């Protein structure tokens, strides 16, 4: 029997009792899972298909396979699946802005799948030390220098090592990890999580040299001593307000404040703290100041409450912890009294953005206010440090790069992460590091640049590249399934540390999902278009109960030869007993074909 003949209409096939139209089928496999006789079975994974969540994940994770494994309690397999495209699931599972969830096909039904919490669950329960690594290629004997041990630099180092290159990472700080390790507070991202993932990178043979700042002279030597160089120095400085009084003692940049707390454990604040800014760094600083003993903490944001750039969840947690938020105000001047910080003069901000959506604050200078403060933390953005770079590489406040290859104007030098773009997030830095690794491998081995330039859909895939395909292999995004067919399912939310325990310690606030909750959440995933259409493996075994048609969320995908009113919902067991098989309303006896004579098939 030619099983493929039953996938689509085929005039040459004399008997086609049940068929699946691959143009309509969304490969959700509800039919195969509900089939009582195994007429339909699961098929192989579909090549090139990419779900909406995966298309919007900068790191290129195969989200559907993560939910598939967690659904079955296979947390180690889920962790291995994530690390095939992203070496930092422990970090991303805690602090990623998860754009994947905003594109989830389940949203029209109830709520999107909590893929961010599932990524963390894969790390928490997948025993990180046993997470398998992708196979390493034989050594190329090529040497690569990476400047900066943040998410972009370490990601590039991780995949360059897998691709067979000898990698040395130079980090100015006393620890590796970049922003996640140095600037995100312990209560959001424990140091032990970052350290364990840095150790995984080092386990591939990557030499990470901390306390190794690179100046212009040292950088010039690197370009001579190594076959290629990747610059990933990030944006390690706080931006200045540019107002009178900013140099008053007691005014500190947020990046420096967070670093002092994380590395030196000696950050100090007064009783009345004002944090300038409305982003995640501002909420981190405000919540940290409260934990360090400040009695009053106020955030002053140019943006309105609904346009603040900080994650809504972080704003809500800050307010729960007693942080006050003053929106639509800008700083006019910082005042001192007897040489000490005393207050801030504020002016009303009418709008933080122009009509094109660009950051361009406009003020009503006639509307003013004042706020007392003995500590001011400036969290209005981050700045790069390009003091080491060749002048040919500089483009304003960042390094000039080719957006496809991440090459700089200096041959053999590549750049990525925050230093090469104005779009700054950890997961986008990871994506940049992975793309750089592929581009550098092509440069070092004389490969074809077209694999990076191919017009695929979605993010870069190291797995596809190593398999000999294009770096962006996606070729289609499936239509959204009819979500109502799947039925509602309550989203599982992570447990949170109680308010009193939060503010009196640096313990992690988000406690994550339990194993059971993670499995339950994974089962909410539709796994859109994950596989090729089901195989109708044994068509002559079909009872025509109609369950597959009833369960199918894609009308017209399943076609039956029997008329609807003659589908059989009953079948005789070997004992002679009749039993119901799936239909909500089985047809009356006068409309049922005789048991044992269904399409020429004799039942026991």
Please name every model-derived segment.
Residues 11-13, 316, 320-322, 330-340, ...:
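Mid-to-C-terminal Rossmann-like scaffold of FAD/NAD(P)H-dependent oxidoreductases
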Residues 77, 138-139, 143-147, 195-243, ...:
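Feature captures the FAD/FMN-dependent oxidoreductase FAD-binding
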Residues 166-210, 261, 286-333, 450-466, ...:
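Rossmann-like dinucleotide-binding cores of NAD(P)H-dependent redox enzymes
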């Amino acid at each position: 029997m030619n099983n493929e003949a039953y996938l689509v209409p085929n005039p040459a096939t004399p008997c086609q009792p049940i068929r699946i139209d691959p143009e309509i089928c969304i490969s959700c496999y509800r039919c195969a899972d509900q089939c009582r006789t195994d007429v339909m079975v699961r098929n192989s994974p579909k090549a090139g298909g990419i779900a909406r969540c995966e298309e919007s994940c900068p790191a290129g994770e195969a989200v559907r396979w993560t939910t598939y494994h967690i659904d079955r309690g296979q947390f180690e397999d889920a962790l291995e699946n994530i690390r095939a495209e992203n070496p930092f699931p422990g970090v991303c599972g805690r602090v990623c802005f998860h754009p994947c969830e905003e594109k989830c096909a389940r949203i029209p039904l109830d709520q999107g799948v909590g893929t961010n919490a599932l990524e963390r669950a894969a790390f928490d329960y997948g025993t990180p030390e046993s997470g398998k690594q992708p196979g390493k290629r034989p050594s190329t004997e090529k040497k690569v220098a990476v400047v900066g041990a943040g998410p972009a630099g370490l990601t590039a180092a991780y995949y360059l090592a897998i691709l067979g290159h000898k990698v040395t990472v130079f980090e100015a700080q006393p620890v590796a990890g970049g922003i996640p390790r140095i600037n995100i507070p312990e209560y959001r991202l424990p140091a032990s999580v970052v350290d364990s993932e840095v150790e995984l990178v080092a386990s591939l043979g990557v030499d990470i040299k901390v306390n190794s700042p690179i100046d212009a002279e040292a950088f010039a030597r690197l370009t001579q001593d190594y076959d290629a160089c990747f610059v990933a120095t990030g944006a390690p400085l706080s931006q200045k307000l540019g107002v009178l009084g900013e140099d008053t003692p007691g005014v500190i940049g947020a990046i420096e404040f967070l670093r002092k707390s994380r590395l030196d454990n000696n950050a100090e604040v007064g009783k009345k703290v004002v944090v300038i800014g409305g982003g995640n760094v501002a909420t981190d600083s405000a919540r940290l100041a409260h934990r360090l003993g400040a009695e009053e903490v106020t955030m002053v944001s140019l943006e309105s409450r609904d346009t603040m750039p900080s994650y809504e969840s972080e704003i809500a947690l800050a307010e729960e912890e007693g942080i006050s938020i003053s929106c639509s105000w800008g700083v006019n001047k910082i005042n001192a009294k007897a040489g000490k910080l005393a207050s801030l003069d504020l002016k009303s901000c009418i709008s933080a953005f122009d009509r094109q959506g660009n950051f361009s604050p406009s003020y009503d200078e006639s509307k003013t206010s004042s706020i007392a403060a003995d500590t001011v933390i400036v969290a209005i953005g981050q700045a790069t440090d390009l003091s080491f770079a060749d002048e040919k590489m500089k483009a304003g406040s960042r390094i000039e790069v080719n957006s496809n290859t991440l090459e700089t104007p200096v041959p053999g030098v590549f750049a990525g992460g925050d230093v090469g773009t104005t779009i700054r997030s950890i997961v986008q830095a990871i994506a940049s590091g992975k793309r750089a690794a592929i581009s550098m491998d092509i440069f070092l081995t004389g490969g074809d640049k077209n694999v990076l330039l191919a017009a695929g859909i979605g993010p870069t895939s190291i797995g596809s590249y190593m398999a000999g395909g294009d770096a962006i292999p996606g070729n289609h995004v499936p239509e959204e399934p009819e979500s109502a067919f799947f039925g509602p399912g309550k989203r599982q939310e992570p447990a949170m540390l109680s308010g009193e325990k939060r503010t009196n310690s640096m313990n992690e606030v988000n406690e994550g999902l339990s194993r059971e909750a993670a499995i339950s959440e994974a089962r909410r995933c539709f796994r859109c278009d994950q596989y090729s259409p089901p195989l109708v493996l044994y068509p002559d075994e079909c009872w025509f109960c109609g369950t597959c048609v009833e369960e199918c969320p894609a009308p017209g995908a399943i076609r039956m030869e029997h008329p609807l009113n003659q589908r059989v919902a009953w079948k005789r067991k070997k004992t002679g007993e009749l039993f119901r098989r799936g239909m909500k309303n089985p047809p009356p006896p006068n409309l049922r074909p005789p048991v044992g004579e269904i399409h020429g098939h004799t039942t026991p």
